[in-house]
Amino acid sequence: MGYEEIARANHRNGNNCSASLFKAFAERLGMSAEEAARIAPAPRADGGKCGGYLAGRMLLEKMKPEAVEEFEKRFFEINGDNKCASLIMKRRLQGKNCNDLVGETASIIESLLQ
């Protein structure tokens, strides 16, 4: 299973967006999934920002800091915003949900790590 599938499965199993992504990349961080979930940023922290967005930034800051700016660019190209509430509303109108965002974010991170 790839990072996108793992992150989506984590989310379907009840993890929040941020923890889902951190757990998916735990091995790459050199820690257990439980340890990774504990250091994941809180959802809607930092002024209501999306947990997936915050997790993506933080994961890349730890694994490939020079890719953070490109991550932000790609995230905004896909989503147009990084605020949790507006992303939820926008995605509902598109027939998508947070699980889709988690998967897309994992895919962006994975592509930037290659």
What are these regions (language model features)?
Residues 23-25, 59-63:
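Alpha-helical support elements that line or immediately flank enzyme active sites
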Residues 67-114:
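C-terminal binding/interaction regions
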